[in-house]
A protein has these predicted regions:
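Eukaryotic intrinsically disordered, low-complexity regulatory linkers and tails enriched in Ser/Thr/Pro
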Residues: 1-17, 21-79
Length: 79
């Protein structure tokens, strides 16, 4: 998982835009830039500082893992 923090206080908002995504490909280009392809991603606007942001991310990851486990348990055939 790749996390990018974009402070919005420069725009007068005072919040942080957190972008998270999975990186598929990273390669240099002819113009000395880097091309990054993302398989999926999303944005969250948060007011908390970085420590609280990572706490929110961890909670979201734990919730996703729990939901996946429940889904797998429901797909197991009963004898």
């Amino acid at each position: 998982m790749n996390y990018e923090f974009i402070p919005l206080h420069k725009l007068g908002v005072g919040k942080v835009l957190l972008r998270y995504s999975e990186i598929v490909l990273i390669e240099p280009t002819r113009n000395e830039y880097t091309r990054i392809d993302l398989s999926f991603g999303d944005y969250i606007i948060v007011e908390e500082g970085p420590v609280e942001i990572f706490r929110l991310i961890k909670n979201a990851e734990l919730l996703a893992a729990a939901e996946e486990e429940i889904t797998q348990q429901n797909n197991i055939p009963t004898p």
